[in-house]
Amino acid sequence: MKSAAQKSKYQRIAGALILGLALAANNAFAEKIKKPKLPKSYESKAAAPEITDADRMFIDLREAAKKNDVFRAQQLASNLVNYPFDDYVAYFRIKPQMFDSAGGPRGDYSADAQVVAFLNQYQGTALADRMRNDWLLVLGKRKDWSRFDAEYAKFVLDDDTQVKCYALLSKLSQGENPTKLAIDSRSVLLDPSYFGQACQELVPLLVAAGGMTPSEAKAIGRAASEKGFDTMARRLGGEDPITEIVKAAKADPAKTYRDFSQSASRYSKENQAVAWGVIGQFLAKKLDPNADDAYRLQQELGYNELLSAESQEWKVRAGLRAKDWALVKNAIEGMNPAVRVRDPAWTYWYGRALKVEGQDAKAKENFELIDNQYNFYGQLAREELGKSNQAPARTKVGDQEIDTMASRKGFMRGERLYAMNLRFEGNREWNWELRNMTDKQLLAAAEYAKRIHLYDRVVNTADRTKEEHDFSLRYPTPFRDELSPIARQIDLNLAWTYGLIRQESRFIINASSSVGASGLMQVMPNTAKYVAKKIGMTNYTNDKLSDTNTNLTLGSNYLNMVLVDLDGSWVLASAAYNAGPSRAKLWRERLTSPTEGAIFAETIPFTETRVYVKNVLSNANYYSSVMHGKEQSLKQRLGTIAPKTATQTELP
């Protein structure tokens, strides 16, 4: 169970022992649950890796670097002269000299010589690319464009929004066409959460250079305001005539809808349009049917390009929820191209909208754009085309190909970092090693990860193949000896359970969340106590939640409980496991008519839960195919969700 809230799951069981679980609304609920056998032992079978004193000092150095504590980092690094990860020791020593305590780049020259020496010594490594990323932020802050440009050309990952904004600032300072740069910025300036100082400088300068209109700048600022970054919003676009409407819509969109209906005529056509877009977004996130009306008013006025990425996406969702296919089509056609292509959802729903209009040939073209993707919408697109959703033919690799992976430097370093529970650094090393691998090499690397029980790396690595696949690696079934009897005893679908675990923890036994969920099934402590009591697990304490069998027992039973509580719907139960059963019931209650499961999933208000449900159901479909070797229908699994009055639940 995960961050947004505690989670839950239930499923019917024919005949068996009955749990004394009485929901206030329905006593019969208790008769749907079968009491499971309890784990034989609470003791974890996993042996803790040996951590040396030097390792502990290294971990302390990492923490000092995170805090940009220059003195502490220098002190610890001086005692790790012969430590095996000499590059990390050097990086953790140098990095605090480049950033202040708040995390901002210092913009001075004090660390330059050390950075250059580091980049030369560790050229071509993952950590050198990380160091270059950091230095680019420093170079950008001090407007050292010649050096910035030289280093930016060597930045391999190029995944930092601020660095991209500095790259555009560099081009602007050198006289490149501001209109072209403004167009290029549209694919960068999508999420204000990542803007930082660089992007806040870029937008006003593009306006001053004539490349961007004041209205476009205000739209970018408004996107920041929608997310609560009001100071940033003013820096980006200046004063916005609809600032108060944005604030009101966030607080009470229904009231704002009523009020603006009376006062809209006081505003310009442009400001009316963007205001209706903002109001529509926040109504849609409340699943208010008036969202469709608000967006229709915006559509009539135009100015789609001035809506934030968030508003553009929720415009589609509002249309889907209302079954307003004309709005769905218009919303997708009016999207920023960068927003439209980043998620296959919009290609799929555009195809569906075309199909409603009778444009079958064009609909088919859209489905074919994504039918080679092995994800939620790729599966749905294949079904629209009448194609199979069966797992592709398996490509096998030989032992010799797998053996060669053991000597790969990135994998060896990654293993040691994982042993110290430094997953971020371990993933960096592992993923860097995967660059430029062929499909067969990726499968060999995934098999190697399986040998050493790094199941999250099995999934991550096998997931990268393009033409040659092995879905038994993409969708592995570790801990099957433990999980199968638990699921069988309570009649819980094994493929769905694996699909959920794959999403929850990627099979990392000691996975933990910031809110306290832990283990393979990310069970919250309070939920664990509740379930343990209901199934008769005596003497349970939360320190036993780290035991694999205990975690699987409690998580599976909770999943089963929410499934029963939510009438056997995998979509609703998956949502409940992530966000809580009360929320899932509320989202169902707000439907105005029976709705296909795919639309329900796409219109879940919480981003985390929306992504979660789609991934769990997609995973479950492929797990079922891998386990049974038969074609599977994702549409059937999604089913239809009918509106139903939300009843109180005892479940956490």
Language-model features: locations:
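Alpha-helical repeat scaffolds
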Residues: R72-L76, P105-N120, W145-F155, P178-D191, ...
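Generic helix N-cap/helix-start motif at coil->alpha-helix transitions
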Residues: P49-M57, N68-D69, N82-A90, Y109-A111, ...
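Structural motif corresponding to the intra-repeat A-B loop/turn of tetratricopeptide repeats
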Residues: K67, D100, V138, R142, ...
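Residue-level signature for tetratricopeptide repeat
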Residues: E63, F92, P96, V138, ...
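Bacterial N-terminal signal peptides
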Residues: G15-A24
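Catalytic glycan-binding domains that act on GlcNAc-containing polysaccharides
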Residues: N82-Y83, Y91, S263, E270-Q272, ...
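N-terminal leader/linker segments that initiate helical-solenoid repeat arrays
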Residues: A30-F92, F99-S101, A391-F411, A419
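Bacterial N-terminal signal peptides that target proteins for export
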Residues: S3-A14
